[in-house]
Amino acid sequence: MCRTPRGGKTPHRVRGEATVSSREGRTMRRWLVALALAGTATVALGGCVQPHRADGDLIDDWPPLSAPRLFVPATDACLPRITPVVQAGTYETVECARSHLAEAVHVGMFTGATAGGTRPEPGSPALRTARAECDQRAREAIGGDWHAARLTLNIALPSVTGWLSGARWYRCDLSETDSIDNTRPVNRVGSLRGALVSDNPLVHRCFDPKLIGNNLNYMAPVLCTEPHRAEFVGVYVERDMSWAVFTRSSQQVHRRCMGLIAAFADVPNNSDLPYRAGSIFYPPSQREWEEGDRGVRCFLWSDDRRLTRSMRGVGPKGLPAI
């Protein structure tokens, strides 16, 4: 049974500026005032003492001004708040051992045409290259696909002022979420690095879906040894298409998920498969989709019997066609 309404829900997603503080500039102004006063004194004493001739170059002995340094946020840092735009004046990090909302797993740089134009807007297709890089860096940091866990990935950008001043960075922020249905980031303690290398409660496993009529209300996580009707089987990457086309492609998504279910349970992907299980799927939000996220989460769905074990590798006898 294809539970396409699971994909119809759009959960809430929460997703810098250059400052130049020049002490040299203030010192320079003092020196200019001092030189002006010295010149006045020289003129006043001109009738009495032969003035010392200047060398003609008023600035040859001044230290050169250092180039303005653009603000770039730190990577491998944890953040007490999440904002799609980072202001240098309000930028703040905390130790990952303390409570925080996100972890910056990478800071990259825009290049090419994107870097030469106006600043990309959050949720725009101009962020596709950045999101692809963020996705790969997140995988490297946590040891697996973040879609397979209670995690969400957001991109932070410089302010428009920072962009106009030359900032071309983007930051990849990874956060723990409350559940697969509520993807609002929640506070956590500890770094996410290596989180998916070993067994971790963040990873999606078994669920007992709660329905209202034929529509999914939410997915309650349970132990796989407890009675349940759904289990996470994996993620597939959807082909490139518009959001409008994707929302009309539930049957195609269902077929792709059924292929993952067959591989997960080690059963044939044939005409008997719909009599063994159905699918539930969670796509990216529209904003994530527009930025280039194509990861669709797939779940095995057992609508006619409760399961009390994982269906991973059970074969045709463990997941019979009925």
Kindly give the residue locations of the regions a language model identified.
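Residue-identity detector for glycine
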Residues: 7-8, 16, 25, 39, ...
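N-terminal export and membrane-targeting signals
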Residues: 21-38
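Primary mode marks residue(s) on the alpha4-beta5-alpha5 output face of response regulator receiver
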Residues: 49-322
